[in-house]
Amino acid sequence: MEAERPQEEEDGEQGPPQDEEGWPPPNSTTRPWRSAPPSPPPPGTRHTALGPRSASLLSLQTELLLDLVAEAQSRRLEEQRATFYTPQNPSSLAPAPLRPLEDREQLYSTILSHQCQRMEAQRSEPPLPPGGQELLELLLRVQGGGRMEEQRSRPPTHTC
């Protein structure tokens, strides 16, 4: 890709006035080389930080860079694109018949029973705090064994 040249160089104009050695006059805002940093603007003029011309070149360069990136990404996506062939026989695309309702219900009940068995197998009693067993034995002796058994409730049975 060739670098963009300013319009005045393409038109064949001489550009800003120069002295015998090819340097611009000291009060000029032009640069002798493209790679040289811009000269400070004369006092009282309002320019961007890069100067009016540099800012437009910067935006042009940014735009060209973004175009290159977009083109490269587009090519890369095209290279990675897979081809998809559809079969000529449309009957092979017909959906499979649905299973009867009984099969679905049986599958559901099988899954549910296996999950319930797993849950029951993984259950454990919560640990008692330190000294908890002695406290329970003391309460049992004080209140009497019969009264505690009368107040005890049965845990619900799991229907799984």
Swiss-Prot record:
Alphabetical keyword list: Cytoplasm, Phosphoprotein, Repeat
Where does it live in the cell? Cytoplasm
A GO term, aspect molecular function: GTPase regulator activity
The protein's matches in Gene3D superfamilies, at most eight in alphabetical order, are given as: Tetratricopeptide repeat domain (1.25.40.10)
Top-level division of the source organism's lineage: Eukaryota
Identify residues that carry Phosphothreonine: T62
Residue segments, region Disordered: 1-55
* One Gene Ontology cellular component: cytoplasm
Tissue specificity here reads:
Expressed in heart, placenta, lung and liver.
Composition-biased stretches (Pro residues): 35-44
Instruction: Please report a single Pfam family linked to this protein.
Output: GoLoco
- GO biological process entries: positive regulation of cytokine production involved in inflammatory response; positive regulation of inflammatory response; positive regulation of leukocyte chemotaxis
Task: List the PROSITE patterns hit by this protein, alphabetically.
Answer: GOLOCO
UniProt biased composition (Acidic residues): 7-22
Task: Please report the stretch or stretches of sequence annotated as the GoLoco domain.
Answer: 62-84, 104-126, 132-155
Primary localization:
cytoplasm
Modified-residue entries (Phosphoserine), positions: S35, S39, S56, S59
Domain comment from the record reads as follows:
The GoLoco 1 and/or GoLoco 3 domains exhibit GDI activity towards GDP-bound G(i) alpha protein, but not the GoLoco 2 domain.
Quote the function comment for this protein. Answer: Interacts with subunit of G(i) alpha proteins and regulates the activation of G(i) alpha proteins.
**What is this protein's record name?**
G-protein-signaling modulator 3
Organism the protein comes from: Homo sapiens (Human)
Recite the lineage of the species: Eukaryota, Metazoa, Chordata, Craniata, Vertebrata
